[in-house]
């Protein structure tokens, strides 16, 4: 059975460190996991999509996702690890957890964005929600 990890990527410095941690972890354990780089774009509310055609919305979400994934893809190509990148649309936390489960990932790796637990709860932190929703281990990288 091949080990696979989902790495949540939003283009931030903490998510870049999550990618670096996955590379380091694979090298130190002498693993060749399949890495799923996943960026989740928010779905636009219906009152916005009434005025913008679906193709424009799709293009915007794809371009934004590609920008967020670019650096992570470069790092993984240089590492020689097997990976695939995915841009999904929806609420970030449940979308990440669902993707990880559907693809039999052994863990989710994501950056911790440095909010305190109380602030994170009030802000609806994606990290807090993923930890709460996921039946899989979640590795948070500072």
Region locations from a protein language model:
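Small/aliphatic-rich secondary-structure junction motif
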Residues: 1-51
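Small-residue (primarily alanine) positions within well-ordered alpha-helices
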Residues: 15-18, 22, 72, 100, ...
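Phosphate- and divalent-cation-binding pockets in alpha/beta enzyme and binding domains
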Residues: 17, 95, 117
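General small-molecule cofactor/ligand-binding pocket signal
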Residues: 36-38, 84-88, 139
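Short beta->alpha linker loops
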Residues: 52, 87-91, 113
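A short acidic, glycine-rich active-site loop
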Residues: 54-67
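Structural beta-alpha unit
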Residues: 74-108
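Gly/Ser-rich helix-loop-strand patches that form or flank binding pockets
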Residues: 98-142
């Amino acid at each position: 059975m091949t080990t696979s990890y989902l790495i949540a990527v939003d283009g931030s410095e903490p998510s870049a460190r999550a990618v670096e941690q996955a590379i380091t972890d694979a090298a130190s354990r002498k693993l060749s996991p399949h890495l799923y780089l996943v960026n989740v774009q928010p779905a636009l509310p219906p009152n916005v999509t009434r005025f913008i055609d679906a193709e424009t919305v799709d293009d915007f979400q794809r371009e934004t996702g590609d920008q967020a994934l670019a650096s992570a893809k470069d790092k993984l190509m240089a590492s020689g690890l097997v990976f695939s990148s995915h841009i999904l649309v929806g609420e970030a936390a449940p979308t990440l957890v669902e993707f990880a489960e559907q693809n039999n990932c052994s863990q989710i790796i994501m950056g911790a964005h440095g909010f305190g637990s109380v602030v994170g709860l009030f802000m609806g932190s994606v990290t807090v929600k993923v930890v709460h929703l996921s039946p899989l281990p979640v590795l948070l990288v500072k």
